[in-house]
């Protein structure tokens, strides 16, 4: 048989191509046959809604390559609807792409440092914001113990600059940058290459970020709010 990498490469043909799949099921003699047209799969990572006449709500589930543009669009849509206050929900957001997080913070922060990383040799890399889109309305960021990595970069910068209030419980505490290195046999190794620090120089690894207001938030909030997903 083929390993997982080979199977995935067979399925990942050009957009618009048709792939014929034959599915064998354990305990079943008959095969299932499907013809599937390949297309881009859009995973919604940003959802938003006006909670009332003044309060906008944006839920960010992860920081992937399309999240920054969706976040920017959500902000613009809420502004058009008269938003005067904003809630950003990062609960259960396990992180994602560092550059995406920085692009989103460029829609929020004043001019200055967003985050910096240091490798084992002490080499420092800084990510900065020009402050052209500083968010100046009341802001709350919801976090919990499953807000990690890029979600902590985002919430840590908001807290350090004092432009918003963190509400919830202490975050996860993942303050390292990791890289996946592929091996010749198709496996991969995840290596830690550096640590990151908030604008004020705080190392949050294995410590997390304490919210400004500690409260056990109702996890059903997202289910109670009918949100609009950015396609």
Predicted regions and their residues:
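A short, sequence-level motif marking secondary-structure junctions
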Residues: 36-42, 195-196, 211-212
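Active-site/binding-pocket entry motifs
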Residues: 42, 64, 114, 197, ...
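Metal-dependent DNA phosphodiester-chemistry modules and their immediately adjacent helices/loops
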Residues: 149, 199-204
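Short acidic, Pro/Gly- and aromatic-enriched capping/linker segments at domain boundaries
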Residues: 183-194
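Conserved functional hotspot residues or short segments at active or partner-binding sites
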Residues: 203-231
């Amino acid at each position: 048989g083929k390993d997982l990498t080979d199977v995935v490469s067979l399925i990942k043909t050009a957009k618009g191509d048709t792939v014929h799949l034959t599915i064998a099921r354990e305990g079943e003699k008959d095969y299932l046959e499907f013809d599937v047209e390949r297309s881009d799969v859009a995973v919604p990572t940003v959802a938003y809604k006006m909670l009332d006449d003044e309060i906008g709500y944006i839920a960010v589930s992860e920081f992937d390559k399309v999240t920054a543009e969706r976040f920017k669009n959500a902000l613009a849509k809420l502004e058009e609807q008269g938003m005067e206050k904003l809630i950003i929900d990062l609960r259960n957001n396990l992180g994602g792409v560092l550059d995406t997080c920085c692009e989103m913070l460029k829609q929020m922060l004043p001019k200055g440092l967003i985050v910096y990383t240091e490798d084992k040799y002490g080499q420092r890399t800084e990510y900065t914001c020009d402050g052209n889109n500083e968010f100046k309305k009341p802001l709350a960021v919801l976090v919990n113990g499953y807000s990690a990595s890029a979600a902590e970069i985002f919430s840590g910068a908001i807290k350090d600059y004092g432009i918003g209030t963190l509400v919830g419980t202490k975050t996860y505490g993942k303050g390292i940058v990791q890289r996946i290195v592929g091996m010749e046999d198709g496996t991969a190794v995840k290596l830690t290459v550096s640590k990151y620090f908030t604008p004020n120089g705080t190392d949050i690894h294995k410590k997390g970020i304490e919210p400004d207001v500690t409260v056990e938030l109702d996890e059903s909030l997202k289910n109670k709010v009918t949100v609009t997903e950015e396609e």
